[in-house]
Every structure is written in structure tokens, then in C-alpha cells.
Amino acid sequence: ILDEGETLAAVVEHCRAHRAASVLTAVLVDKLHERKVADICADFVGLRVEDRYLYGYGMDYRGYLRNAAGIYAVDPVDCD
């Protein structure tokens, strides 16, 4: 998930510091909000979604639902 972009920015910088000929990035999910690191965006994106808590396909919700056969968003009411 590309959320705020700190990790992706660090990986890109690491690759460039080690003289990669080119660096392209891919993310399964890009969250749409204004908290991203400046100038960070993925070159390839599977889904673009609102800023919601997601689960399924390896992402858990409170320790459960990691094996859900899809990507789902938690209702904001349930995110307390």
C-alpha cells in the first residue's frame, strides 16, 4: 500500500544511491490523500482508493481477515 510514501521514497533513494540504471515502482493500492511525501507516486498502480483502513489479501484487520479473498475497506464507524 502506498500510504504516506516514506518507505517507497527510501527504497527509491537506496536504489538510486546504488546507481540503478532506472527505478520504477509498483504498488497494489495507492491511498488518495494529502499526507504523502512530496513528489512520491508509483509508476504502476493496481487500485486507487479513498483513505480508508483496508484488509484482505494479506492485510489484516485487528489480527483477523488476512485471508479474505478480496480487498475490503473498514466502515469508518468501526475504526475506533
Which sequence ranges carry the predicted segments?
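PRPP-associated nucleotide enzymes
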Residues: 1-80
